[in-house]
């Protein structure tokens, strides 16, 4: 028979024993890392997203005049040095260390002032290997290899962030279910809609001029290819630096802000009426962010609702609320097909079809809805990739791969169009820029864009139509569909880095600078890519993201270049090789640690 007193006594004894055990466990708990020097402990990868970063904790010290140097590895290693400002010290409660090598005992020197006394300390920071979580039988390598071809004196300190990707074993798994036609039966399959299948794992890193990885964004930061969750799927693109030294980016149904320490500062879902963000995010001088998206449940003239493809620009504030919308289906002409029918069927942006490479695309009236080449809001008619913001008149400049380069004001009126004349309706044709030579004399060009007795050329299937601080426009001219046709042989194609001067008052365009045509097919990059003028070294930086794309079974080359503006000499050339064959890269950009830790 169970005695109530014995039960109480037993319960009390057990409770006392557990209490003593718990108290002992707390008293004997594992200790935190102890100070590594005169400051605090070192924490590698403090936010869990950037394993080649670390923090030296302040441990309640008040310091200033901070400088960090991550020493190069071996005799030829590239040191990474930068100052750390008051704001960064307060933000991280420590000294941010950027530019570590993977799986290496990194030598780091920190200089600072405390209580008026100059201090200098040396540390050794151990890192682990970085890991590609998406490998399969197609993998050529675990990480994307690099090949340094040339680095001129004076450019050794350059660091390049590569925004590329790797195929997942399962491929694209999702699509939006579109609205059925009114004549469709109950059991008839619904059509695809939107661009949800645009889904691939990110591969984001910084490379130095020795070809070494010096930063890595963990693939799980924004993406999860192992879970059926569309909020963690998409295509991480449009990584652009803000004035604060942070970065914005888009992926699928979200847009983000993060820093180089791996801290995610903002994670916003797209506003309710929009979906499928890819290609671009850019912060304006007003502190707002421009995003390239599609429209959810767009109603066509026949009453059918569709999700549009890459033809909407939204401006959002830092809380994610919509400030403005540019609906290109109403501003441009979604039925213009002059370039669409001239494209290489083997590659439309990052959608690659090797079996039809080199063949001219055929536009069929019954082309399926969704992310398919064709006219109408329900198809990939515009394909806007990068965006530029012109603060002088509060306007945007869009690179529409399938239409041309267009400047549009905040009033939604087209200011000018840079494209061949063929196929534009009367209203838009009046906005076409007229080509002129260096003296302002008109050039003779046919409607397909072929010009006589000049080296002027329009850009075709272009990327990154960005403004320079000189007021000129730099464009990566991919060159597919040049003169609105496919050449007799694919090897006749070429890509260019181009600079144009736009005279908005007179409606003219003048060629100023070009590079790449002379390098021929070996330099041809049919899709993606970027160029940008670099004032600090007077160079044109370029990343040709899809060289070698159609060579079956071979890695695709993403070629990093800096070209001297005056002489056109190659100052930097580094190849990035995809880890799986025929897998394109997207973009790259220069990063400056001095600007990231103010």
Curated annotation (Swiss-Prot):
Positions of 4-methylumbelliferone binding: 279, 383, 463
Pfam families the record matches: Arylsulfotran_N (PF17425), Arylsulfotrans (PF05935)
Intracellular or extracellular location(s): Periplasm
Chief localisation class: periplasm
Keyword Transferase attached: yes
Comment on pH dependence: Optimum pH is 9.0 using p-nitrophenyl sulfate as a donor and phenol as an acceptor substrate.
Disulfide partners: 445-451
The protein's Enzyme Commission number: 2.8.2.22
Cellular component, GO, one term: periplasmic space
Active-site residues from the entry: 463 (nucleophile)
Reactions it catalyzes: an aryl sulfate + a phenol = an aryl sulfate + a phenol; 4-methylumbelliferone sulfate + phenol = phenyl sulfate + 4-methylumbelliferone; 2-naphthyl sulfate + phenol = phenyl sulfate + 2-naphthol
Keywords in alphabetical order: Disulfide bond, Periplasm, Signal, Transferase
One annotated GO molecular function: arylsulfate sulfotransferase activity
Membrane-spanning parts: none
Signal peptide: 1-27
Family under the similarity heading: Belongs to the aryl sulfotransferase family.
Description of how the protein assembles with itself and partners: Monomer.
Role this protein plays: Catalyzes the transfer of a sulfate group from a phenyl sulfate ester to other phenolic compounds. Is able to use several substrate donors and acceptors in vitro: using phenol as an acceptor substrate, 4-methylumbelliferyl sulfate is the best donor substrate, followed by beta-naphthyl sulfate, p-nitrophenyl sulfate (PNS), and alpha-naphthyl sulfate; using PNS as a donor substrate, alpha-naphthol is the best acceptor substrate, followed by phenol, resorcinol, p-acetaminophen, tyramine, and tyrosine.
Name the record gives this protein: Arylsulfate sulfotransferase AssT
Species this protein is from: Lelliottia amnigena (Enterobacter amnigenus)
């Amino acid at each position: 028979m169970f005695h109530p007193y014995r039960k109480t006594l037993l319960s009390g004894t057990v409770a006392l024993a557990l209490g003593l055990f718990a108290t002992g466990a707390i008293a004997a708990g594992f200790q935190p890392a102890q100070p590594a020097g005169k400051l605090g402990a070192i924490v590698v990868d403090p936010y869990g997203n950037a394993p080649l970063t670390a923090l030296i904790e302040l441990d309640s010290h008040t310091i200033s005049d901070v400088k960090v140097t991550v020493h190069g590895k071996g005799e030829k290693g590239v040191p990474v040095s930068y100052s750390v400002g008051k704001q960064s010290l307060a933000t991280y409660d420590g000294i941010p260390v950027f530019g570590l090598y993977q799986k290496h005992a990194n030598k780091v020197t920190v200089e600072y002032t405390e209580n008026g006394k100059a201090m200098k300390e040396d540390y050794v920071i151990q890192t682990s290997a970085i890991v590609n979580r998406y490998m399969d039988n197609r993998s050529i390598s675990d990480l994307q290899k690099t090949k340094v071809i040339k680095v001129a004196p004076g450019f050794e300190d350059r660091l390049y962030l590569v925004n590329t990707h790797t195929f997942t074993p399962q491929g694209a798994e999702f699509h939006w279910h579109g609205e059925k036609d009114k004549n469709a039966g109950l059991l008839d399959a619904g059509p695809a809609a939107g661009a949800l299948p645009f889904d691939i794992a990110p591969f984001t890193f910084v490379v130095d001029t020795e070809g070494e990885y010096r930063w890595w964004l963990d693939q799980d930061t924004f993406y999860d290819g192992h879970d059926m969750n569309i909020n963690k799927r998409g295509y991480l693109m449009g990584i652009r630096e803000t004035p604060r030294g942070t970065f914005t980016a888009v992926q699928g149904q979200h847009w983000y802000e993060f820093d180089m320490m791996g801290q995610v500062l903002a994670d916003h879902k797209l506003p309710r009426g929009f979906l499928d963000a890819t290609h671009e995010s850019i912060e304006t001088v007003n502190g707002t962010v421009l995003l390239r998206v599609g429209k959810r449940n767009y109603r066509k003239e026949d009453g059918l609702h569709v999700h549009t493809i890459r033809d909407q620009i939204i401006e959002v504030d830092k809380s994610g609320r919509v400030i403005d919308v540019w609906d290109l289906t109403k501003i441009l002409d979604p039925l213009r097909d002059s370039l669409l029918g001239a494209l290489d069927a083997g590659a439309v942006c990052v959608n690659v079809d090797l079996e039809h490479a080199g063949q001219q695309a055929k536009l069929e009236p019954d082309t399926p809805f969704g992310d398919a080449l064709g006219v109408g809001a329900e198809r990939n008619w515009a394909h806007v990739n990068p965006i530029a913001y012109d603060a002088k008149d509060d306007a945007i400049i869009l690179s529409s791969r399938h239409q041309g380069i267009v400047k549009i004001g905040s009033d939604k009126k087209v200011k000018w169009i840079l494209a061949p004349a063929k196929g534009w309706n009367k209203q838009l044709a009046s906005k076409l820029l007229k080509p002129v030579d260096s003296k302002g004399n008109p050039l003779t060009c046919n409607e397909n864009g072929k010009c006589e007795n000049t080296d002027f050329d329009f850009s075709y299937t272009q990327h990154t139509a960005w403004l320079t601080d000189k007021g000129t426009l730099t464009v990566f001219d991919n060159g597919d569909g040049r003169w609105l046709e496919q050449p007799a042989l694919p090897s006749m194609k070429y890509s260019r880095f181009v600079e144009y001067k736009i005279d908005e008052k007179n409606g003219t365009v003048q060629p100023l600078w070009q590079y790449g045509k002379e390098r021929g097919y070996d330099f041809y990059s049919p899709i993606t890519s970027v160029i940008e003028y670099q004032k600090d070294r007077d160079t044109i930086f370029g990343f040709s993201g899809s060289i070698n794309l159609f060579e079956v079974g071979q890695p695709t080359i993403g070629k990093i270049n800096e070209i001297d503006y005056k002489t056109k000499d190659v100052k930097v050339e580094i190849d990035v090789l995809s880890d799986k064959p025929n897998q394109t890269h997207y973009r790259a950009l220069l990063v400056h640690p001095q600007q990231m830790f103010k």
